[in-house]
Amino acid sequence: QGNSIPSLTAALREERLRNAALLMLRPGAFPEVCGRVCPSMRLCESVCPIPADLGGPVPIAALERFAADYLLDGGWDPWPLASNGKRVAIVGAGPSGLACADVLARQGVNVTVFERDSEIGGLLTFGIPSFKLEHALISHRRRMLERLGICFRLSTAVGRDISIKNLLQNFDAIFIGIGAEFPVTPNLPGLDGHGVVWARPW
């Protein structure tokens, strides 16, 4: 999903803070996360046409973060539609699974998310240090999603604790978002040597 940055900056300039935040908090978007972890200086901000001597580039990630925090800190919750009777199972509570759950729940779908870890977020929770992304943000997002009616079945591994066959029998659709669990192994000598530590366990 792309964000309309001109619309965001215009709303902020005119002090329409709620409007600015709602532009960012569309279904499936997590600006409170993206505004903190996105390498914006290498992406959108790197092509900003405003030169440095005029104050550029526009700090887009910081603006997204500010707008989202403004509304979320005030206790905003999205409103789901009435249930349409459809049931969807989502395997994996990482970013893609959470985004899918958010979009579906706001359309009235009954969503159950199965996650083998003890908390949602995937690498947002277990792969990014808290000085970069406060884990309280993920906990806050979980409470928001639960208020949308999303059910989280944590510490539940599909294939171990519940079968795919069971999901197929009890849900209208299944979304599998199990993420990038294993690192890309470089073709280098000494990878099994003393002092070599992989990022996620560290």
Each predicted region: which residue ranges?
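FAD-binding core/adjacent interface of flavoenzyme oxidoreductases
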Residues: 8, 33-34, 42-91, 150-202
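Short amphipathic alpha-helical surface patches that mediate protein-protein
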Residues: 13, 25-29, 39, 53, ...
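Short hydrophobic/aromatic-rich motifs at helix boundaries and adjacent loops
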Residues: 16-19, 72-74, 112-114
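Residue-level marker of structural boundaries
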Residues: 17, 29-30, 72, 129, ...
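Immediate flanking context of iron-sulfur cluster ligation sites
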Residues: 18-43
